[in-house]
């Protein structure tokens, strides 16, 4: 699966949304919250994965219709945008860098009480705030145990550092590098 692949590679992060049937066309937000939590409870713990809470309703200009689309692509895009406007060690969430674009509404808009259940369960809520837009309101990786690596920005920073160190270290190969030499 993708989480195992990311764990083996150690240079990527996987962004995962819940199943469409868990949130789209379900009228009761309590049921949606339970469905989302149950789906992600079955997935492995990893700092190389990021879970979000659902789907956005947007216009598909290629087919001239509105449709629900998973938010995992948006969350990956927020990380890419964070790289452009700040640095990988900044959080992609919040009102400054976490604005989801192109969304008309959310299939599941978690309440404060639901967010308080989802976030400790490793799920980053995406929330529509009236007059303020739709925002990624979390910064968690899918790591189950408390650690610095249970934050998206910390995992992304270490991926960047590991690549930079590997690049710099290859130039020290075959150089004098011990006490004798």
Mark where each language-model region is:
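Structured, hydrophobic secondary-structure cores that serve as assembly/anchoring elements
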Residues: 1-180
């Amino acid at each position: 699966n993708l989480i195992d692949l990311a764990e083996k590679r150690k240079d990527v992060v996987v962004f995962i949304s819940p199943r469409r049937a868990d949130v789209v066309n379900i009228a009761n937000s309590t049921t949606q919250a339970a469905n989302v939590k149950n789906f992600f409870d079955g997935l492995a713990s990893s700092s190389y994965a990021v879970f979000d809470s659902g789907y956005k309703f947007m216009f598909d200009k290629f087919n001239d219709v509105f449709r629900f689309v998973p938010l995992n692509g948006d969350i990956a895009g927020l990380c890419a945008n964070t790289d452009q406007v700040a640095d990988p060690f900044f959080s992609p969430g919040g009102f400054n860098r976490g604005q989801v674009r192109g969304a008309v509404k959310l299939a599941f808009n978690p309440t404060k009480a639901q967010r308080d259940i989802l976030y400790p369960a490793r799920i980053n809520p995406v929330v529509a705030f009236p007059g303020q837009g739709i925002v990624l309101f979390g910064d968690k990786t899918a790591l189950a145990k408390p650690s610095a690596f249970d934050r998206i920005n910390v995992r992304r920073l270490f991926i960047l550092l590991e690549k930079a160190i590997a690049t710099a270290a290859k130039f020290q190969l075959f150089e004098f590098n011990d006490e004798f030499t």
